[in-house]
Amino acid sequence: MNKIIGKINVLILSVLMIVSGTAAVTGVFNTNRLTAVAADDTIILRVCNWEEYIDTGDWSDDDIIDLESGSIKGENSIITDFENWYYENYGKKVKVQYSCLGTNEELYNMLTLGDDYDVICPSEYMIMKLMAEDWLEPFSDDFYDTSIANNYYAKGVSPFIKKTFDENKINGESWSRYAAGYMWGITGIVYNPDKVTEKEASTWTIIDNSKFRRQITIKDNVRDSMFAAVGAIKSDKLKSVSFINSPDYRERLAEEMNDTSEANVDRIQEYLQSVKNNAYSFETDSAKTDMITGKVVAGYQWSGDAVYTMDQADEHDFQLNFAVPEECTNLYFDGWVMLKSGINGNSEKKQAAQSFINFLSMPENAVRNMYYIGYTSVISGGNSDVVFDYLKWNYEADDDEADT
């Protein structure tokens, strides 16, 4: 995994240099209600995340991240380690009830049906929706106080991510009032170079290319499928020299990719119907296996899943590549938020929820999660060298393989 993660990290950072600013953000249940506190006064923290999106432990003997600043290995799940850390630091027991969902839309539907969580990890567009609809509990005033020893998020978050969350607002309030970043990345096309050329994969129009009928997968969520559709519909314009060289390129790109006019929405719906007839499937997670088994030759992927897919292919001795469409890419964020209905005025639960976010933001834990799931953390480490050492470790692994 190390070689591929290193390459994708470089790719994401390179894309960031191109699409920073406005375009960087735009792309430019009803179950039984759980009690908040158990009978023995253990704090119950209900966390909902995406599938395969946190270190679950049980690493193999070979899975050791040997950094200059020390070795890192996931023996326990990061959830178990948090529960132990919280008791050691705050003298109170906490039990995380952890569950997973597949899409932002599924998450929203479950919330509207009455399912209760304390901490969830939606994507940026769903964070904005939940903020606008007053679902979210704001962070405590001291959450961003860098003088507090355990405020690892405030001390370690990437300056770019901090600026993005501070400057983007809903109803006059910054994202950072309600959300802390977790992972981020770009979208693109994973493809089999024996079946698909780099040129064919480097455009959103591949999703409707009849040459690959029933051999390509598309993301099964509104934001990503519509983004790809807009990129394909407006491909010629977005790739034109006059458009790219325009002095207000970023603003124009954001305007084109966020065009919600009735005419454009109608075009998108019509186009996605043709894509549905061409694609193998609209999916959330299955494309990773479908690419590895050869059922499909290309798939629209988040960069973290691209890392996993290419790594698994490498273990089976065949190559998969990742292409960023020339039109533009979508730079996305997932972030941790607290729900008002879950916290419900309980100060102990709120402290546990914020501590969970801070624990995940420890540089060592950010590295564990990056290594395990393949995505790029929003944590750059602040004064800690751990994240930087991890990047060096990836690059050196890449260089070592190139020399052999």
Where do the model's predicted regions map?
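Mature extracytoplasmic/periplasmic domains
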Residues: 338-404
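Extracytoplasmic ligand-binding site segments that recognize negatively charged/polar headgroups
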Residues: 46-65, 69-75, 125-278, 282-286, ...
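Sec-dependent signal peptide cleavage junction
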Residues: 18-40
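Extracytoplasmic/periplasmic substrate-binding proteins
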Residues: 277-345, 394
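Short beta-strand and adjacent tight-turn residues that come in two discontinuous sequence segments
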Residues: 101, 122, 218, 282-283, ...
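Bacterial N-terminal signal peptides that target proteins for export
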Residues: 1-12
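Short helices/loops that flank or line small-molecule/ion binding pockets
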Residues: 80, 84, 105-117, 132-133, ...
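Early extracytoplasmic/lumenal segment of secretory-pathway proteins
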Residues: 37-129, 133
